[in-house]
Amino acid sequence: MAIWQGRSLRKPSGGRIVLARKKRKRELGREPSNTRVAEQDKRKIIRTYGGNKKVRLTAAAYANVFDKSGKGRKVRIIRVIENPANRQFARRNIITKGAIIETEIGKAKVTSRPGQDGVVNAILLEE
């Protein structure tokens, strides 16, 4: 079923609000992509408002990890250690912005939005 992101059709009292127009396609939302740790990257290109395109990362194997000096490396993601968005996400290996991931070179904090950007960027955490 579609996710509609328009105003509620009910008043606080429970009465109905009669809209002056129909629902618009641009007001539809989508289910979250829930980017998971996998053996290889998997991307999905979707059409957005205005005919633009958005790249969704549905499965991630690699992350671009940057250290304090700004030098970056493409490294393999091992697992999700912690996710402040939802503690169940760490158990399910779902990557979101702010998640702490374990990589080949150490722990890193995700700075990009994989479901919106189509890539996992992270900064290396000091041990």
From Swiss-Prot:
Transmembrane intervals: none
UniProt subunit comment: Part of the 30S ribosomal subunit.
UniProt cross-references to Pfam families, sorted A to Z: Ribosomal_S8e
Keyword vocabulary terms for this entry: Ribonucleoprotein, Ribosomal protein
CDD domains for this protein: Ribosomal_S8e
GO CC aspect terms: ribonucleoprotein complex; ribosome
Cystine pairs: none
NCBIfam families: eS8
Family, as annotated: Belongs to the eukaryotic ribosomal protein eS8 family.
MF annotations from Gene Ontology: structural constituent of ribosome
Taxonomic source organism: Pyrococcus abyssi (strain GE5 / Orsay)
Name of this protein: Small ribosomal subunit protein eS8
InterPro entries assigned: Ribosomal_eS8, Ribosomal_eS8_CS, Ribosomal_protein_eS8_arc, Ribosomal_Se8/biogenesis_NSA2
GO biological process, one term: translation
